[in-house]
Amino acid sequence: MEQSKKYLKLSSIAVLALAFFSMLQLVSELLFGDINQAAIPEGAPDNILLITRIILFAVAFLLMLPNIYIGIKGMRIAKKPNASKAHIVWAIILLAFACLNIIEPVVTCVSDGMKSENISAVLSIAVEITVFFEYIKYAMDVRKNVA
């Protein structure tokens, strides 16, 4: 239980870093016009924003892996004889939804580059972290009811 709280805190920090970086880019775009020119220091490689974004995505995703493990563990709990079929279906839906919606923004940003229209995809990761929070609370409730 303590370990899951630690991972939730780390995931929250990663999401805050992503949100802060996205807002910084958005503000620089509003102030200077071209996001790719405004935030790049002189002499830096042209794709430094994309590289920074990919690093932040990688950190956030690695911090979410324990949450995925907790979700799978919650599915195992839902498979116990006292659990209803609704528990199992709900666990599968939440886990699949969270995993797909974490991967999709990363693929979009890597394939299309960091354009201003992709900022919403980046910020959607924060929404998916919320899904993980809800899923973990649900898995813990199932554990209390079934165990």
What are these regions (language model features)?
Residues 1-31, 44-47, 141-147:
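Cytosolic juxtamembrane helix and N-cap/initiation of the first transmembrane helix
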Residues 13-17, 83-100:
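Transmembrane alpha-helical segments of multi-pass membrane proteins
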Residues 21, 25, 63, 101-104, ...:
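Alpha-helical transmembrane segments of multipass membrane proteins
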Residues 2-7, 68-86, 129-147:
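Cytosolic juxtamembrane helix at the C-terminal end of the final transmembrane segment
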Residues 25-40, 72-75:
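Membrane-helix exit/juxtamembrane interface segments
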Residues 9-15, 97-141:
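Alpha-helical membrane-associated segments of multi-pass integral membrane proteins
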Residues 49-67:
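A loop-to-helix transmembrane entry motif
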